[in-house]
Amino acid sequence: MATAGKVIKCKAAVAWEAGKPLSIEEVEVAPPQAMEVRVKILYTSLCHTDVYFWEAKGQTPVFPRIFGHEAGGIIESVGEGVTDVAPGDHVLPVFTGECKECPHCKSAESNMCDLLRINTVRGVMIGDGKSRFSINGKPIYHFVGTSTFSEYTVMHVGCVAKINPEAPLDKVCVLSCGISTGLGASINVAKPPKGSTVAIFGLGAVGLAAAEGARIAGASRIIGVDLNPSRFEEAKKFGCTEFVNPKDHNKPVQEVLADMTNGGVDRSVECTGNINAMIQAFECVHDGWGVAVLVGVPHKDAEFKTHPMNFLNERTLKGTFFGNFKPRTDLPNVVELYMKKELEVEKFITHSVPFSEINKAFDLMAKGEGIRCIIRMEN
């Protein structure tokens, strides 16, 4: 493209300080360096992780910053040494990466790349420790290596998954984070057998994706557990067959589920990060074969307490990161699940706003309205 090797001026939504509305600014985006790519973002969506670090209540604040990590775009130019993608390729940016060289990437059992694993504090590129964004010569910091709330962004090549160009980016953009996390927790980690019973704790976007994964796997009963009963009707679209609101019962949720399922569920997936829900999700699975999968991220001081007999009675506890998907290797296949109509993505997308109204997406999430809001970069 004519812009290759040059600085691009474009619009970006800049967070100048914690918790304050984003401001649409003209930023300068430097060309990609070695092993980097510059991507024209066409669609992005807001994930709770963006909001969490924008609020910056419990972690190191890094500002001014460009948030955003769930998106779809097209490669504009590539830096030295990049051979896997070329200008014009359709890609999904990913908050974690796959260098393909480290022990994790070479292992069939892990997706936790040593080089490109998620880092929420670093606001610069790993190659030279500098930001590719600036306003009047002053750096604007990156977020989890993606920063998709900008018309153009620069990423390490290991953090972009090349996908089928026929796939509609305004739909599959949501597969680059939360939906794949929940989906993979079910199909890659919990692996519910056909006809099994699965409990899903937390019916936000990730939990609904976990329910969708259980549905695809062939589970016959999918029990949604949530303190907010207004989520129940919507969750039926994702395969949930029945529901438990812990507030409606005067005994622990794990006992309620055991009563409903003749001793416990076959699989559970915990998507809230609440430590009590994590313990309940483990203790509600059936002895002998039950598997519980933890997805939600707990408070840093949380402690997981359960009796060792729960393990000795042959219950299994697993954790997962990004649904155990390797970003570059596996995401193209997740997109193909959608293209083959096996995975229904549209039902996750409840709202859409132009880039100029990006703060509306934050308002919707604050009110708990909808599941995913697509932000259209071109009005």
Swiss-Prot record:
Major subcellular site: cytoplasm
Protein name, entry field: Alcohol dehydrogenase 1
Sites where the protein binds an alcohol: T49, H69
Residues that, per the record, bind Zn(2+) 2: C99, C102, C105, C113
Alphabetized GO MF terms: alcohol dehydrogenase (NAD+) activity; S-(hydroxymethyl)glutathione dehydrogenase [NAD(P)+] activity; zinc ion binding
Organism: Cenchrus americanus (Pearl millet)
Binding site for NAD(+): 49, 202-207, 226, 231, 272, 295-297, 322, 372
Subunit structure: Homodimer.
EC number: 1.1.1.1
Keywords: Cytoplasm, Metal-binding, NAD, Oxidoreductase, Zinc
Catalysis performed (reactions): a primary alcohol + NAD(+) = an aldehyde + NADH + H(+); a secondary alcohol + NAD(+) = a ketone + NADH + H(+)
